[in-house]
Amino acid sequence: MTKDMTTGPITPLLVNFTIPLVLGNLFQLTYNAVDSIIVGKFVGEDALAAVGTSNPLMTLAILFINGVCLGAGILVSLAFGAGNTELVERQVSTTAIAGSVFSLVFSLTCVILANPLLRLLQVPEEILPIAVNYLRIVFGGLLFTFFYNFLAATMRALGDSKSALYFLMISSVLNIGGDLFFVKVLDWGSEGCALSTVLSEALCCVFCLIYIRWKVPVLQLGRRWFIFDSSLLKKTISYGWTSAMQQATVQLGKIAIQAIVNTMGVNAMAAFAAAGRIDDFAYVPQQNIGHATTTLMAQNRGAGKKERVRASFFCGLKLEFLYAIFITAVCFFFAEPIIRLFVTDAAVVHLGVRFLKLVSLFYLMPSLTNGIQGGFRGLGDLKITLNSSTLNMAGRVAAAALFVLLMKMDIEALPYSYVVGWILMLVYEAPMMVKYLRKGEL
């Protein structure tokens, strides 16, 4: 069901739209943990290591595609907010056609480059064949990844975040069921796990299309799914490419940080992995609030309602601030019991607690950066979000390399490197947002 977000109280609209986004991502994080448990338990340590070492590349490809869909979704929100159903149809069909061609080319490229990319990451020879096979199967299904993310992004752009949540839950349940069947019953190893991922996304695409046919009249395009509007393509590429590059930049930064952590020893790696799981639960809702703010602003911008655009932005910032206070308190005061959920070794727990307590003190900073980025996306200025994310990751990686590799600091150096990145991000973003406010463009 679509939701017109250009009327009604803004705070309830934003909260109700954000909650399914948060639940969906938390569900995805939980699934990722279960997926690793199944591989580790029923296949073995080599397979788990192969899947684990493949995940950064797999995540990079998926986030790139997700970025394309996010950028295209903003254009759909603008058209829907303006009440231009015909433009919504042309935007959706054009993105679907162009995205399909791109996904097939991207998929083939990734399949070919899987081996050299894994070698670049210095994957041990004994698990390299397992990792290559796993990655090639996942990369082979990137067309389904695109359509699943595109349909979900389109429904969110139309104000329907609940349906996207339901389909994410269905996909995750299918994936877990497929993992158990292919891995435990058929004994297909990590390849079975990869096949389960591809098939679950393919089935979810079918379910999405059935639902759209049944419940979303504006997307019941029929033959119009094959309409390609070249006049829309340039803007779609601009939004999609910029958003995709931002997502890719963030993931590349994470890979670089992990490489630096790997030089600190096994205990630090384990502590960082445990604390990193908690970090995900801290950051993801902040990102979701930013994405919800984007949709609300874009619909109202399309409708020409400047006051609601401005009010939506500041409402998003307030929610970001409130969540930051909550998650800071939880992670600081309950750091040790939370870390012990993941590890039991005393030395690892000690390192993990130190990291989590320190980084939690700065959670207000990413809440501000995510809120501001949501605002820029809602205004259609994605270049600023790309530039600020690049500054963030460059500063973070450079600071981590300085603190850890040159100054030989321990795990407590990493939160400070995060702060360097966030400060650079805010120093760049804040003046830009002030300019928008002073010019009356927000």
Q: Model-derived features: where do they sit?
A:
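Small-residue-rich hydrophobic transmembrane alpha-helices
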Residues: 48-108, 145-164, 271-335, 366-380, ...
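Hydrophobic transmembrane alpha-helices of multi-pass small-molecule transporters
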Residues: 60-63, 175-179, 204-209, 281-284, ...
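Transmembrane helical elements of multi-pass membrane transporters/channels
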Residues: 16-35, 137, 148, 171, ...
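Short runs within selected transmembrane alpha-helices of multi-pass transporters and secretion channels
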Residues: 69, 137-156, 164-172, 193-208, ...
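Helix-terminus/linker motif at the lipid-water interface of multi-pass membrane proteins
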Residues: 26, 30-49, 118-125, 181-188, ...
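Short alpha-helical transmembrane segments in multi-pass integral membrane proteins
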Residues: 1-18, 76-141, 185-241, 297-362, ...
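Interfacial/gating helices of multi-pass transporter permease domains
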Residues: 39-59, 125-130, 190-193, 232-239, ...
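N-terminal transmembrane alpha-helices
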Residues: 5-42, 56-71, 75, 100-107, ...
